[in-house]
Amino acid sequence: MFLKATLLLGLAVLGMHVWAIQMEFVDISKDLDYFVVSVEFAVAWFNSDNTEEQAYKLLEVRRAQQKSWTMIYLMELDLGRTICKKHDEDIDNCPLQESPGERKVNCTFIVDSRPWFTQFTLLNST
């Protein structure tokens, strides 16, 4: 009986370990459609949450990862302050600020994406 209980406990621990490994973030293509939309959401969220008047735009995607078997994306982004205001249109084509106030930031976001519902949730940001 003790041997069976030990074996069962060992299998349960092994199963949890395998499940945890499968739920880790893995590298993905930066061009993956749902990832790109999630990046746009993260940049828009950054601009709306930021107290500055100027808008920031995407400069570079440093890291693109997805949690296995989910639509949860981890992204590390470089953003640059533009000369445009937050609510201006076409911020992507707005020039970067080139003055002593020039500012570039590196941010990490975790976004839960449900694009078929047009629903995105920011789970974490730094």
Curated annotation (Swiss-Prot):
Residues 1-20 form the signal peptide. Coiled coil: none annotated. CDD domains: CY (cd00042). It is found in: Secreted. Pfam families: Cystatin. The keyword Disulfide bond applies. Glycans are attached at residue 106. One of its GO terms (cellular component) is extracellular region. Keywords: Disulfide bond, Glycoprotein, Protease inhibitor, Secreted, Signal, Thiol protease inhibitor. Disulfide bonds join 84-94. One of its GO terms (molecular function) is cysteine-type endopeptidase inhibitor activity. InterPro entries: Cystatin_dom (IPR000010), Cystatin_sf (IPR046350), Cystatin_spermatogenesis (IPR052333). PANTHER family: CYSTATIN-12-RELATED (PTHR47393), CYSTATIN-16-RELATED (PTHR47393:SF5). Belongs to the cystatin family. This is Probable cystatin-16.
